[in-house]
């Protein structure tokens, strides 16, 4: 009996031990395979001071810490930050100490702390909150108002306070959550949770890592979700939000523009002889106006007689405005609302007086220090031109990193045509080379189209070339017309050979102790350029300048520009 009892005890002990082992194993498995619910501190993730009361802003994945503020429950962002990173249209005018914003028809003025704003006709508009506030001398704009006027997508996040903004519209790879799921800091169920997302939430796909998918949430977290918890990858392009668009004035036909240089009113009389050998032109841009001082005054060589002659031939006239007077303080000019208004009023009144059809801004001395002020002038002139039915065009350099301050994308919101000057590849003072090689022209047109849109782009080509002379290592050049370059070659008893790479005839030869080089512009080089222009299907071609061309190039231009 005792033996039996002892055996039973032994069995009980063994059973208890087995159960204990099983429980411990189960607990181990539970601990090992149960996802942690621990949340990562958002301030730690974004590397922010937890005591900050500022709003972080993320724009197309770029983080800007301690940027915005919250006032009366609304997010406000610095005006300068908004203009530089989100919407260049919100401009701060130092002279009136107000924010200016232009849509397709009006310019609006917002004073700090006021629940009312006005347009340029004097009409007032009421708001439930001040669009603009001043905090310690810094101008802030209500994000809610900015978002209403910006083509973007955004979400709010908290702890820390943040706005995640998407402006770019490129196609993105995305997935959706199949169920409520955790987005974790690292790939693994023991990694802390960044954010819980709901079933159906869209997440931007970054990459696959084994059983996990790296994603970006709508509030800006980059983390990991289990691959089984999300859908297959799909392509997403955010819906375009309709912005206030300029009511463009575009011609139904391809534009063939000729710049007509005059240095005084008497020069207008040569228009008949100049155009007698230039068939196919439908726009003439005479160099009538030049800014002469920081108050916005201009020299005026305009002629109603020239306009009437052109109209009788079915040719439009776009009066050119230049900024070549280096004595003018352009920073002072463009930053002054009074000066900008003076220029606008002068040009509009002269359009009434002379009857020209458009304005061509040839402002080639804009610097980054005052480029925002220049763009505001373009906006203000655009509104005035639209009201008068005047075409507005701007002349611009080939897009490069050094001239991004011209902001062609912003210009294109307000001007009818952006003319890219696809020349001056080499210029007086540079090394010897082509004024406009074919690759240079092609790149200029393609890069402009990417920023502007083909229906608004006019490709500018040269009717001139350079004759380069190098003596004892010193290079000089002189600009000449097409025939003058040929005459120089013939006078020197030399020949030029076609260069396929640059799309031009090229000559290089010795004259005494000097080397002379010429990259020619003529029918064949113009044809190569016109083929590019036709392929890009842009709005037309502009030619600098009338009188420098061989008459035979016009049939080539007409062949492709139709």
Question: Residues of each region from the PLM?
Answer:
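Primary recognition of N-terminal secretory signal peptides and signal-anchoring hydrophobic helices
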Residues: 2-209, 231, 238-250
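SH3/SH3-like beta-barrel fold
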Residues: 101, 200, 213-217, 225
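A short macromolecule-binding patch
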Residues: 175, 219-230
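Glycan-recognition patch characteristic of GH18 chitinases/ENGases
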Residues: 236-346
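Glycan-binding loop/region signatures in secreted carbohydrate-active enzymes
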Residues: 238-241, 463-529, 561-562
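Short, acidic/polar
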Residues: 263-278, 336-352, 400-409, 521-534
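Conserved, mostly hydrophobic/aromatic
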Residues: 284, 361, 418, 459, ...
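Substrate-binding surface in catalytic domains of secreted glycosidases
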Residues: 294-301, 345, 368-489
């Amino acid at each position: 009996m005792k033996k039996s009892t002892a055996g039973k005890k032994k069995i009980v002990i063994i059973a208890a031990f087995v159960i204990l082992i099983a429980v411990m194993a189960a607990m181990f498995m539970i601990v090992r395979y149960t996802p942690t619910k621990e949340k990562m501190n958002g301030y730690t993730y974004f590397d922010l001071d937890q005591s900050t009361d500022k709003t972080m802003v993320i724009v197309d994945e770029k983080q800007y810490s301690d940027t915005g503020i919250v006032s009366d429950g609304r997010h406000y962002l610095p005006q300068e930050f908004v203009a530089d990173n989100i919407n260049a249209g919100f401009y701060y005018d130092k002279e009136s100490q107000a924010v200016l914003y232009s849509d397709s028809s009006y310019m609006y003025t917002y004073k700090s702390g006021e629940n009312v704003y006005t347009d340029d006709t004097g009409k007032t508009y009421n708001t439930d909150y001040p669009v603009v506030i001043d905090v310690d001398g810094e101008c802030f704009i209500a994000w809610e108002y900015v978002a209403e006027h910006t083509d973007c997508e955004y979400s709010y996040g908290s702890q820390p306070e943040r706005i995640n903004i998407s402006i770019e519209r490129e196609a993105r790879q995305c997935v959706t959550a199949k169920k409520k799921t955790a987005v974790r800091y690292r790939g693994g169920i023991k990694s802390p949770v960044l954010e819980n997302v709901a079933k159906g939430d869209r997440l931007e796909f970054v990459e696959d890592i084994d059983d996990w998918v790296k994603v970006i949430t709508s509030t800006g977290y980059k983390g990991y979700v289990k691959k089984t918890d999300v859908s297959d990858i799909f392509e997403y392009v955010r819906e375009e939000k309709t912005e206030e668009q300029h009511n463009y004035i575009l011609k139904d036909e391809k534009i063939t523009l000729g710049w007509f240089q005059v240095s005084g009113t008497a020069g207008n009389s040569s228009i008949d002889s100049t155009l007698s050998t230039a068939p196919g032109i439908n726009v003439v841009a005479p160099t009538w106006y030049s800014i002469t001082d920081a108050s916005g005054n201009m020299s005026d060589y305009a002629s109603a007689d020239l306009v009437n002659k052109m109209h009788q031939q079915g040719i439009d006239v776009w009066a050119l405005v230049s900024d070549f007077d280096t004595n003018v303080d352009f920073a002072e000019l463009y930053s002054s609302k009074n000066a900008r208004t003076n220029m606008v009023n002068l040009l509009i009144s002269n359009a009434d007086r002379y009857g020209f059809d458009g304005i061509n801004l040839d402002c080639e001395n804009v610097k980054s220090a005052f480029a925002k002020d220049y763009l505001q002038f373009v906006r203000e002139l655009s509104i005035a031109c639209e009201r008068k039915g005047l075409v507005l065009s701007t002349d611009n350099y080939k897009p490069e990193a050094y001239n991004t301050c011209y902001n062609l994308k912003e210009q294109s919101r307000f001007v009818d045509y952006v003319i890219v000057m696809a020349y001056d590849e080499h210029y007086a003072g540079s090394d010897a080379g082509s004024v406009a090689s074919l690759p240079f022209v092609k790149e200029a047109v393609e890069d402009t189209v990417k920023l502007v849109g083909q229906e608004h782009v006019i490709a500018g080509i040269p009717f001139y070339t350079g004759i380069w002379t190098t003596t004892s290592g010193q290079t000089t050049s002189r600009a000449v017309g097409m025939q003058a370059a040929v005459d120089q070659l013939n006078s020197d008893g030399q020949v030029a050979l076609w260069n396929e790479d640059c799309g031009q005839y090229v000559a290089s030869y010795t004259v005494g102790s000097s080397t002379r080089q010429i990259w020619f512009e003529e029918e064949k080089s113009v044809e190569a350029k016109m083929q590019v222009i036709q392929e890009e299907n842009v709005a037309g071609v502009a030619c600098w300048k009338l009188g420098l061309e061989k008459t035979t190039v016009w049939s080539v231009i007409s062949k492709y520009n139709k």
